[in-house]
Amino acid sequence: TGRNTNLMTAAASCTLNALKVLSGLDDAMLLIAPVVLEPILRLKKDIYGSDKPLLSLEEVLISLSISAVTNTMADIALKNLDRLSGCEAHSTVILSPGDDIVCKKLGYNLTCEPAFASNDLYDGK
């Protein structure tokens, strides 16, 4: 399972949790160091002007790849990424287009409820 956190989207959270299970890693283990995530979030907020900077699934997987260089547990999780292909996944909301594309690339059999994640659909910029 996964849900939006203050750092990442539900699809990203769910994927990390699935990788932990497939890799036999403890759920409480941090696979991506905050020192990797914080600059990305700061960039999205301060430079891109995002008022709700959440890391997408693609950004989290890139961060996991970077972390795998120095974190053996992240490396183990990354090596199990191909095992996600064919997994059944269901979202109670429509995923963002970016997360939806990455889920398809990973091979998820994904279904979604016909509900948007937010009522704030107009960016206004």
Task: List the model feature ranges, each with a label.
Residues 5-24:
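A short, polar/charged loop-to-alpha-helix boundary motif
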